[in-house]
Amino acid sequence: MIQKDLILLLLICLTIISCRTPRFVYSPAPPNNPYFRERGESKLAAYYSTGADANELTNEYNNGFDLQGAYAVSDHFALTADYFKRSEKDGIYEDNRTYFDTSLVRYKRRLTSIGAGYFTPITNDRKITMNIYGGLGFGKYSFSDDGFDNGAGYHRDYSSDMTKWYIQPSINFFVGNYFRTGLISKVSWVRFNDIETSYTSAELSYLDLDRLPGRTLRFFEATWNVQVSFRNKNWFYLDGGFTFSSDPFVNDDTNLEARNFNASIGISLDLSKINRKNNEQ
């Protein structure tokens, strides 16, 4: 009898935990990973990004764009800059949660970062390079939450300033004249400040959002990036990749989560090669 009661209690606890739907505090982006080998090389890139978790039946989406630039100021050092923007929507339809039976959560994220890094070939033919970059970014994270709670409509807002800093080691491979690929890892620290919200204290505690003010969360990301160029267009690259992100590393059990996947496709230009080609002519 006692064993059956323990099993029932465990099932109830699991049900309560599983129904505590998260509010996602982080979304990954394609890393700014230049394929530099010498001074004067440049990068100007634009990407369409998606979390690949859209649902047409519930009109959910997760997409945005990324802009990136970089310039090699010497044969081993470079400067970077990038801009990130996301729009996301989650539909949550459950009637057995403590708060918010039905929710439509719409996220907005934006971040501007600058950075610097070191790159060097590690083979005599310069077909493999090692790189390490770091940077600092500032941005905004916000969402609106609309739905029904015990049959009554509700609306909540949440917004926070973000400060992000990161370190990003990578290895790039140059395969032939028109193909190159990179394996990139990234550790990011994100701090949330100046939070404004219309959630009650009990609701913030239920969603674990009361843990965010003044707290720095750490995330790990891994990316595979591919660039393809064309004959007589070696300054132009089709650029795409997949990024996987961890949830935040915390010492206690929490409902704070990250979007765990991002796919990106776009173009990358090296304007220095256009100038070099014109000078040769």
Mark where each language-model region is.
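Predominantly the C-terminal beta-signal and adjacent terminal strand-loop region
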Residues: Y206, D210-Q281
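Transmembrane beta-strands of outer-membrane beta-barrel pores
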Residues: Y48-A54, Y83-K89, T120, G134-S142, ...
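Outer-membrane beta-barrel translocator domains and adjoining extracellular loop/strand segments
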Residues: A29, N55-E60, D90-Y99, Y141-G153, ...
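Glycine- and aromatic-enriched membrane insertion/assembly motifs of diderm outer-membrane
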Residues: T58-T120, G135-F138
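Residues that define the transmembrane beta-barrel architecture of outer-membrane proteins
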Residues: E38-S42, N59-F65, K85, R106-T112, ...
